[in-house]
Amino acid sequence: MVFRRFVEVGRVAYVSFGPHAGKLVAIVDVIDQNRALVDGPCTQVRRQAMPFKCMQLTDFILKFPHSARQKYVRKAWEKADINAKWAATRWAKKIEAREKKAKMTDFDRYKVMKARKMRNRLIKIEVKKLQKAALLKASPKKALAAKGAAAVAAAAAAKVPAKKITTEGKKAPAQKAPAQKAAGQKAAPPPKTQKGQKAPSQKAPAPKASGKKA
């Protein structure tokens, strides 16, 4: 980037240290390579010689003649609205934030910490929502799987023991008890025995007594 902040008549500078630190001045004349004649009619800085070491040049330039009187400098300053333009720059905002931070108490720093934590929590929640929406939009298969997992989680949270839900989100088929054989159906044949093994002997039922005991 080309350097454009040159020492010239009308250049507005920021005083970084010294008795007038934090104020803006305009260069009225250059005395030598180390000092300049400055004036700050709108910042309560009287016309005086000031070294370049304590000045930082800004991007603002006023149009007034060489070694102009204070009323011409004031008129050019107010016409260019230097104070409002300076307050809107990032440079001025950083200086103001630094001063506010230096004046903060322990309780103020605690409130700032809590506010930052709350802000970060809200940002994380919104980011997760956006990521989930993008995932569902990109792959419909993963969307169906996510819905099935959500259904399983909801069923587990509800704690319904009667209804068993599989991982696919469907009910498990109920097992029916074997029905009893009808009276007219024949019994199944006994299993075949291998050679060398005896067939299990079936005992005949005992005959019922015709007469009752005394």
UniProtKB/Swiss-Prot annotation:
Residues 192-197 are annotated as: 2 X 3 AA tandem repeats of K-G-Q. The modification N6-succinyllysine is found at residues 85, 203. The modification N6-acetyllysine is found at residues 79, 85. Residues 170-189 are annotated as: 4 X 5 AA tandem repeats of Q-K-A-[APS]-X. It is found in: Cytoplasm. GO terms for molecular function: RNA binding; structural constituent of ribosome. InterPro entries: Rib_uL2_dom2, Ribosomal_eL14, Ribosomal_eL14_dom, Translation_prot_SH3-like_sf. Its main location: cytoplasm. Keywords: Acetylation, Cytoplasm, Isopeptide bond, Phosphoprotein, Repeat, Ribonucleoprotein, Ribosomal protein, Ubl conjugation. GO terms for cellular component: cytosolic large ribosomal subunit; intracellular membrane-bounded organelle; organelle membrane. Residues 161-214 are annotated as: Disordered. GO terms for biological process: ribosomal large subunit biogenesis; translation. The modification Phosphoserine is found at residue 139. There is a cross-link at residue 124 (Glycyl lysine isopeptide (Lys-Gly) (interchain with G-Cter in SUMO2)). Residues 172-214 have a biased composition (Low complexity). Sequence repeats lie at residues 170-174, 175-179, 180-184, 185-189, 192-194, 195-197. It comes from the Eukaryota. Component of the large ribosomal subunit. Component of the large ribosomal subunit. The ribosome is a large ribonucleoprotein complex responsible for the synthesis of proteins in the cell. Belongs to the eukaryotic ribosomal protein eL14 family. This is Large ribosomal subunit protein eL14.
